[in-house]
Amino acid sequence: MNISVNGQSQVPPGFRFHPTEEELLKYYLRKKISNIKIDLDVIPDIDLNKLEPWDIQEMCKIGTTPQNDWYFYSHKDKKYPTGTRTNRATTVGFWKATGRDKTIYTNGDRIGMRKTLVFYKGRAPHGQKSDWIMHEYRLDESVLISSCGDHDVNVETCDVIGSDEGWVVCRVFKKNNLCKNMISSSPASSVKTPSFNEETIEQLLEVMGQSCKGEIVLDPFLKLPNLECHNNTTITSYQWLIDDQVNNCHVSKVMDPSFITSWAALDRLVASQLNGPNSYSIPAVNETSQSPYHGLNRSGCNTGLTPDYYIPEIDLWNEADFARTTCHLLNGSG
């Protein structure tokens, strides 16, 4: 049934024509070559050499629904009378084959080939490439020969089977339009994404490279920041004790920045030992404040391995430790 009226295709509203490659070959092209009636004939016959891609778009329009691709039958025209090359030149340009032909299979059987062509404006070999692309489908000879056994195939059709001058079915589309429509129809199309050109990307990479070069690997034994101190004499008296404890730790990790940030607290700690008590009560520390003794264990070393603060009541030095500490202090003062 031909649904064209005055050259315009008349189809019901919402009609879409999206045949698969197998359907194009086994149903439409096979019936076209075999002169078998097609139930719904929506593919027109055109002369590819007399029409430009934008003209094909108007002639092959189906209904009023927007289309991304257009289908038509075309008879292959030889470029030279005695040759086998196909003439695909138009008034303003030409169709040039690109890549290898693709084999089309159905149920493991080869049924045809697909050739991809790109439209160039101008004349070869100095044409200007465009966004128009065409897929040209041709039936395999084995499918054509098997069609001769059908009772409704004309004898004249079998006489031309296997020749290179047969019919082909073509699909034409524009690359940019197809990509835009695919993006707009995707679920994530409503999300706005910034557009970057090559120059912008190069600038970003250059900035990222500079920022990476500017990074410095810090020495774990850099000088500690200035401490809050209220008594210079206290610093002089007890600096040797801290240096001795740190040097004996032999740990590779950086000391916690919270390690002894208040000399006044350390002064109270040592004074309590000199005055006699063997234990020192450390105020409870909540999660939002840092203990000045965080990371200080019984040997006075900062291991940096435990994140928990000590409980309020801790025996910092036993009696033997207290005696050794007193001797060190007396010798140092002398």
Swiss-Prot record:
Tissue expr: Mostly expressed in anthers. Also present in pollen, base of siliques and inflorescence stems.
MF GO annotations: DNA-binding transcription factor activity; transcription cis-regulatory region binding
DNA-binding region residue numbers: 111-181
InterPro entries: NAC-dom, NAC_dom_sf
GO biological process: plant-type secondary cell wall biogenesis; positive regulation of DNA-templated transcription
Subcellular location: Nucleus
Keywords, alphabetical: DNA-binding, Nucleus, Transcription, Transcription regulation
Residues in NAC domain copies: 11-175
GO cellular component, one term: nucleus
Keyword Chloroplast (UniProt): no
Main localization category: nucleus
Primary role: Transcription activator of genes involved in biosynthesis of secondary walls. Together with NST1, required for the secondary cell wall thickening of the anther endocethium, which is necessary for anther dehiscence. May also regulate the secondary cell wall lignification of other tissues such as tracheary elements.
Domain notes: The NAC domain includes a DNA-binding domain and a dimerization domain.
Name listed for the protein in its UniProt record: NAC domain-containing protein 66
Species of the source: Arabidopsis thaliana
Taxonomic lineage of the native organism: Eukaryota, Viridiplantae, Streptophyta, Embryophyta, Tracheophyta
Gene symbol of the encoding locus: NAC066
